Amino acid sequence: MLTLKSSYIKHKTNIYSFLKKAAAITGAVVITACSFSACTPLDGSASRYNNADEQYNAADNESFNAFTDSLFRELASSDSLSLHALLENPSEYGIDDYDITLGRIDIDNIDDTSDITDYITKLNAFDKASLSKSQQITYDLLNKYLYTTLNYSDLYLLNTDLTPTIGIQIQLPLLFSEYTFMEKKDVKEYIQLLSDVDGYFNNLLEFEALRSVRGYTLSDDLLDEVISSCKSIADSAGDAEGMFIGTFNSRVDDLIFLTDDEKNVYKKQNEDAVINHVIPGYNALITTLASFKGTNQYSGGICNYPDGARYFEGLLENCLGWSKSIDEYNDLLDSYIRSYAIVMQKLLRKDPSLNSQFGTFSFGIDKPDQIIEDLKKKITDDYPALSDVNYNINYVSEALNDYASPAMYFMPQIDNLDINSIYINSTGTDSSDLYPTLAHEGYPGHLYQTQYFASTSPSLIRNVIKPGGYIEGWASYVEVHSYEYAGDNTLLNSLVQCNYALILCLYAKGDIGVNYYGWTEAQLSSFLTDYGFNSAEAAHEMYTAFIANPANYCKYVLGFLGFEELKKQAQKDLGDNFSLKEFHRYILETGPVHIDILFDYLKNWENRLVVSSRAA
């Protein structure tokens, strides 16, 4: 049997079945990227800006800068964990007064949208023509983001932060593990935040109670998965060598600005916070979520809930911002599935020996550091240069292995760019999967994109409003193209690449099918069988994953196809003047925006490229 398993693919597929049906199916596309971005100069110099005043050019409208900076300060200070993830020194950005809290949902005013309408009024007061080019892009981004948020604000009860794999109960320990200690204040605030875990979870449970009354609680099997992850964390949180106590102690031991006595005091305070707040918080989740079992009234995809189809549309509009209906997305996926299938068939006709080589395909490297360095060398022809960046590769705690995503990238603080962390889940990622995984998370994926855009000194607000379709679409786009950097057998590389890209498209089809068209598990299984994949267990896992996180797979895959469609348009417009490296530079310098915005500004970039090529 010929098989392929990639970094976000759990199940294997038979290539012969694929040839019979002109398709294949496996896998999953579940990854999270946490935190936000910062800046490095394009020329590789060592300069860094230290406050907001250094970021803007003379062509900017200063009033608009003041508005967006004010919005940034308000959003960034909504909770201290996010604030610290964004800024090491908030006071240098005008943020001096903030509560040390993980944040709260205002249950009593949960449907109040006055803040959004106020932002819209202030934004619309600006004449877009008076803004610089970069400000106009920011204007369009904010306009789309705010109106989309407002238009779907009545559907808040359909959302939950407590889900398998990407739920906050899993992400919170990882966020704490990446909390930087640069001064004594950081250690104190960390312990204060740790002491707020139970209060934070109790607030989330108040919100979940509202969902339960409406019958919106997760299905019992999904609740069991969330509860299981909470139990694993609660059971290990108090371990002397665990992620909350052992990791903290070793980090504190390395802090040269603390005396030995201070280290011992903080270690004791941290342990007390874990015992008295973290573990009780997770136990509260376990007990209360268990009490919600049996209250779900709507089985299947989100479209089966009241206004669920509209909610799914809103999820895609928010993360993609692409002027397409769900039917058009579905048709787009069909066209790419056909295209990839045709290419694969042609490759196998051209070289039938690819059949036997397919199952043994390998990048030839399985050490993370070596893979990153190999990618940095091989991407130079296709992607613009970036100065060297520090990074760390870590492994997810054993307690989270069965629940966390295959890999994650934690973005650096705006004013402390040198801490870039990639986490690998050793359970969810085999060594053979590491190359495309690190292309996704590292070069030329999240790490590279984050640092490159930061080098353009973007407006502060661009660090907190970043459409997921761009972020994850870019990482998926470069992950697919990383197969071009394998061995010298370009035909085999293309075969494996097309197989993986096709798999992603089928996964997005399943997401739409279940969550918008209302496919049952049996219908999903039938769909997979049509493409030569007959595992009932895999179909069940996929169906459950689609229900747990509506539109999550579409965010990755349709974002990826958005860049492919943008590239097709640029190639059509430019002909021989098209440059892949310059096309990537356009995407990277524009930064995280909705796909429509990338298309809107494409012609301006094309005109500049033609002029510069003629001048050369």
Residue ranges and their predicted role:
Residues M1-K5:
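N-terminal targeting leaders characterized by basic, low-complexity, disordered sequences
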Residues S7-T26:
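Bacterial N-terminal signal peptides that target proteins for export
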Residues A28-T32:
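Short, glycine/alanine-rich hydrophobic alpha-helices that insert into or span membranes
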Residues A33-A38:
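C-terminal motif of bacterial Sec signal peptides marking the signal peptidase cleavage site
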Residues L42-A616:
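N-terminal maturation segment of proteins
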